[in-house]
Amino acid sequence: MIRLLYLLVKPAGMSDETFRAECLRHYEMSHDVPGLHKYEVRLVAEQPTDTHVPFFDIGHVDAIGECWFKDDAAYATYMASDIRKAWFEHGKTFIGQLKPFRTAPVAGDEPAS
């Protein structure tokens, strides 16, 4: 499984309500994207600082998105899709900045991708 995680920041001046609505619309649009196994977006409700290890600040984050792909072939299908390209165009309308990460498992049978 390939998993991509995104830290998302809304554009300056966009209301929380508009950002929430566009996140929901983006989630709903994700169901039609070829090769995309699962998409989830969650709004950041709080950024606690009372951690059990030293805290480091990454700046303000409004939401966290994650995309799942079954394998490299599914990811290639996703990348080539015109529907995915249109989905990304929608993302440009409500995502001011993002920071992507491709993650890898620490245990289990799933190979690091």
Swiss-Prot record:
GO molecular function terms listed in the Swiss-Prot or TrEMBL record: isomerase activity
Residues engaged in binding 3-methylmuconolactone: 26, 39
Record-listed E.C. numbers: 5.4.99.14
Catalytic residues as annotated in Swiss-Prot or TrEMBL: 26 (proton donor/acceptor)
Class of enzymatic activity (EC top level): isomerase
Keywords: Isomerase
Gene3D superfamilies according to UniProt: 3.30.70.100
Catalysed reactions, semicolon-separated: 4-methylmuconolactone = 3-methylmuconolactone
InterPro entries, per the entry: Dimeric_a/b-barrel, MeMu_Me-Isoase
First and last residue of the signal peptide: none
Function: Isomerase involved in the degradation of 4-methylcatechol. Catalyzes the isomerization of the dead-end metabolite 4-methylmuconolactone (4-ML) to 3-methylmuconolactone (3-ML), which can then be further degraded through a modified 3-oxoadipate pathway. Can also use 1-methylbislactone, but not the isomeric methyl-substituted 4-carboxymethylbut-2-en-4-olides.
Name this polypeptide is given: 4-carboxymethyl-4-methylbutenolide mutase
Organism per entry: Cupriavidus pinatubonensis (strain JMP 134 / LMG 1197)
The encoding gene: mmlI
